[in-house]
Amino acid sequence: VQLNLVKKTKDSLMKKPHIWISDLTHTAQGISANTFPLGASYVYSYAKQQLGKDFNFKLFKFPDHLAEELKVRSPQMLCFSAYSWSFELSCKFASLAKKRDPNLVVVFGGPNFPTDEVEKFEFLQKRPYIDFFVELEGEFGLVDIIQRLTEYNFKVDSLKSYSEKIINTSYIFEDHLISGSIERIKDINVIPSPYLTGALDEFFKLPLTP
């Protein structure tokens, strides 16, 4: 009975669409950012709490690990933290993954994004592989993106054609910048602790600072 239960659990995980969240670090000369992917793990924990029944979420820190997984399958959505020290690395992964699977939804989120509307447009226009960029609280933005895309069977152009405004999120459609309302987290308790939920357990085994 236990073996059958394990098999059913694995089968259900395989069938559920995969959403991967990455906070990458350079590793050519040691681990450049040798800390836990804390910010991304909060987004991961909140998204899993809200949508874990329907999607299989996974958290990545190391480029080699992400590259190996991408060789096996393409997820439904690939998300990246946007920090200045790893931005180009994330962009390279995003562009290659998008080229391999044009239907892949690519989401970026983080502080490495302009505040001026014109600069936002230029930023996204130069990076067409980025489908959506989430500002400020990534937790609310990512969940809203997933929920909206679910209504459109994850067809990005269909969603964008209706100029859907997504919380904390900007995107380009037909040379227009579409930005949703900004919502801040008012109660930190709505975000599950990634330490208590086990989201960061695997990273304790690695040479990283919690």
Predicted segments, located by residue:
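Nucleotide-activated donor-dependent transferases that construct or modify glycoconjugates
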Residues: 17-30, 77
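Phosphate/nucleotide-binding beta-alpha loop and adjacent structural elements of enzyme active sites
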Residues: 7, 28, 150
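Short, Lys/Arg-enriched N-terminal segments with co-localized hydrophobic residues
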Residues: 1-13
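Glycine- and acidic-residue-enriched helix-capping/strand-helix junction motifs
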Residues: 28-40
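A short, N-terminal amphipathic alpha-helix
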Residues: 43-49
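Radical SAM [4Fe-4S] cluster-binding motif and immediate context
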Residues: 189-190, 194-210
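A structure-centric signal for secondary-structure junctions around beta-strands
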Residues: 16, 37, 163-166
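Glycine-rich beta-alpha loop elements in corrinoid/cobalamin-binding modules
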Residues: 46, 54-184
